[in-house]
Amino acid sequence: MSHVRRFDHVGLTVADLDVVTAFFVALGLEVEGRTFVEGEFLDTVCGIPGSRTEIVMLKPPGEGTRLELSSFVRPDSVPGSPAAMANELGLRNVAFEVNDLQAAVDWAATEGYGLVGGIGEYEGAWRMAYVRGPEWIIVSLAERIG
């Protein structure tokens, strides 16, 4: 018996909600909603009494897994490891299939977000690159080529 019904979302905690939201909206995601959450529910689920967070839920075009961005109002966020590379344990990247990888990489560069490495090709099927986005988030961009 499977306990999972579907993959709902991935959550990222960020410091500057507006900057990170703008990046993902410019990439092609849509804002589904924005709200503050606090009280017993958040305290219980997060295990942080007295917490308050602002959340933006983003959705991809069509259907698919959503991206939840959360910025804590209280308590203050705890810094992560901004220079984390792909081999560091934990959540390392958020991945999106794009129509034109080079155009997406060029756009990211004009916004000040460079490649982690380079553009690679996998078995004639995919071209992919990691971009270091706002707040050092690694964003995987992949184009199906075969």
What are these regions (language model features)?
Residues G39-T44, S77-S81, G117-G118, Y122:
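A cross-kingdom feature marking solvent-exposed beta-strand/loop segments within repeated
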